[in-house]
């Protein structure tokens, strides 16, 4: 057993009696054993199938504090610090061929070296998917000039996915603060006018079906002058609502057949994320984009380490977001 696998096992034991970030990372005791469920059944795991998307988390600092942010980003949360070009380059050098590189946060456009990181990614031939709220950090003159230059050089290989928690301004602002919807729309118009490739990330309300949500987001996109097909999941991704302190069923090996799903389709089969913790000597790799606070899902200091062993699905979000919710952060 390697050092990182030993750390993950110990973290699993500790979770039986601890809560990680009491609401959003509430972990019921039944998820504490990485191999066996509370009923004694074999817990499902996901093996590595090859890199589709490498995520770079530029840090948890954000210009706003959303009520239900998946990783609780805010103007004061710096538990994940800004990535630098020096942090990122070793991971890019590990990659064979070209893949999708995703950049998330926090708000990536607050990262001081974000334009250089984007250049390093695309100059190697990778496609880039950057997640942003399209608000004031992106609209600073230095960032605007840099984005226009990158768009002119790399064209459709650069996609900015803008987060809109609802197509309804009141609901969006209740999540992100008064005026947030209008400010995001201003950023979207600016991107569209300059020919930057844009996608949207929304949330499907619990009382709203997929087709209704897509039609409403499509109407909004059209009003902003965006060339976006709401039926295309690459243009509009709708994430399942995450319920704080949710207690979903555990996923066993038998669930794949029962649900008609494959482990190969789960995010951690082909995606990983690079983070750097505050005070850490170097960047490390997590199993996915959501579980950055749980040490059981911090898998190593290189992509080779972080893809050596299957990921055990012993977290409620593995069930509610990925397996049952069908969520994936990549395009």
Question: Language model features by range: what are they?
Answer:
Residues 1-44, 289-331:
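Radical SAM enzyme core and accessory elements
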Residues 76-90, 108-152, 160, 164-186, ...:
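Canonical radical SAM enzyme core domain
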């Amino acid at each position: 057993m390697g050092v990182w696998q030993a750390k993950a096992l110990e973290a699993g034991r500790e979770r039986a009696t601890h809560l990680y970030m009491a609401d959003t990372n509430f972990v019921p005791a039944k998820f504490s054993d990485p191999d066996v469920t509370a009923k004694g059944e074999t817990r499902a795991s996901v093996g590595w199938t090859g890199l589709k998307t490498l995520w770079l988390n530029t840090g948890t600092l954000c210009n706003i504090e959303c009520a239900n942010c998946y990783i609780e980003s805010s103007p004061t949360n710096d538990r994940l610090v800004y990535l630098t070009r020096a942090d990122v380059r070793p991971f890019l050098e590990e990659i064979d061929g070209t893949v999708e590189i995703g950049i998330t946060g926090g708000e990536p456009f607050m990262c001081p070296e974000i334009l250089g990181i984007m250049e390093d990614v695309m100059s190697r031939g990778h496609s880039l998917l950057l997640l942003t709220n399209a608000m004031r950090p992106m609209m600073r003159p230095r960032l605007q000039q840099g984005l226009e230059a990158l768009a002119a050089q790399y064209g459709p290989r650069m996609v900015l996915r803008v987060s809109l928690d609802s197509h309804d301004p009141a609901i969006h602002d209740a999540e992100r603060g008064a005026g947030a919807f209008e400010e995001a729309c201003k950023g979207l118009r600016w991107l569209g006018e300059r020919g930057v490739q844009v996608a949207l990330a929304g949330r499907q309300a619990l009382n709203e079906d997929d087709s209704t949500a897509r039609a409403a987001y499509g109407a909004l996109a059209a009003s902003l002058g965006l060339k976006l097909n709401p039926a295309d999941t690459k243009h509009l991704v709708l994430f399942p609502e995450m319920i704080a302190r949710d207690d979903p069923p555990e996923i066993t090996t038998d669930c794949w057949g029962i649900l008609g799903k494959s482990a190969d389709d789960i995010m951690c089969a082909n995606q990983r994320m690079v983070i750097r913790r505050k005070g850490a000597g170097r960047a490390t790799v997590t199993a996915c984009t959501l579980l950055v606070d749980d040490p059981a899902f911090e898998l190593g200091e290189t992509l080779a380490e972080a893809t050596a062993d299957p990921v055990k699905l012993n977290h409620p979000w593995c069930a509610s977001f990925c397996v049952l919710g069908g969520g994936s952060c990549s395009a």
